Amino acid sequence: MVPYHIRQYQDSDHKRVVDVFTKGMEEYIPSTFRHMLMLPRTLLLLLGVPLALVLVSGSWILAVICIFFLLLLLRLLARQPWKEYVAKCLQTDMVDITKSYLNVHGACFWVAESGGQVVGIVAAQPVKDPPLGRKQLQLFRLSVSSQHRGQGIAKALTRTVLQFARDQSYSDVVLETSALQQGAVTLYLGMGFKKAGQYFMSIFWRLAGICTIQLKYSFPSA
């Protein structure tokens, strides 16, 4: 196992942080495509439309072209929301990480470094409108480069956020993650997070059958 350490973000980390985050999010494009491909409505479309073309035109070539086009369209649909999400993040909080996190009271951004290179990231910001009587911290942007997974880095980064929250007297740490990110969900549940709810971020995600899961870690004294 290659050694690593966790430290606070520095401006010189920005390019590598963006790279880790972007690649981490775009890895979910293939799994989104596979999930959508196996939906009954998708299978019905892939079989029904080409078959209708064969019955109307008598051309199997046209049917094959239609299937290819539908698969290409499905791939583009699976790709677009992740690309838009990354673009939105890079134009908002991640355009200036120091301003968005390090200069905000009760917030922070950490990186995991190994061999002089950033291999993992995580961020946290206070929840703007928490429930009455609660002081909540939201965990964001957890991602570890594919070459450094399986070494406990994601768990260590999450522990860093939990310790920060404890030190800052937060009552809860909350986060949201896609149901597709089963590895992340398993990690959080194994660390004591509890499911607090779920919802669909948009009509697209509802049609795709992929919900956003809300998780919460409450400190015993809270």
From Swiss-Prot:
SUPFAM superfamilies: Acyl-CoA N-acyltransferases (Nat). CDD domains: NAT_SF. Its EC number is 2.3.1.-. It is a single-pass membrane protein. GO terms for molecular function: N-acetyltransferase activity. It holds the Pfam family Acetyltransf_1. GO terms for biological process: gastrulation with mouth forming second; negative regulation of cell adhesion. Keywords: Acyltransferase, Developmental protein, Gastrulation, Membrane, Transferase, Transmembrane, Transmembrane helix. Residues 69-220 form the N-acetyltransferase domain. InterPro entries: Acyl_CoA_acyltransferase, GNAT_dom, NAT_camello-type. GO terms for cellular component: endoplasmic reticulum; Golgi apparatus; membrane; mitochondrial inner membrane. May play a role in regulation of gastrulation. Belongs to the camello family. This is N-acetyltransferase 8F1. It comes from Mus musculus (Mouse). The gene is Nat8f1.
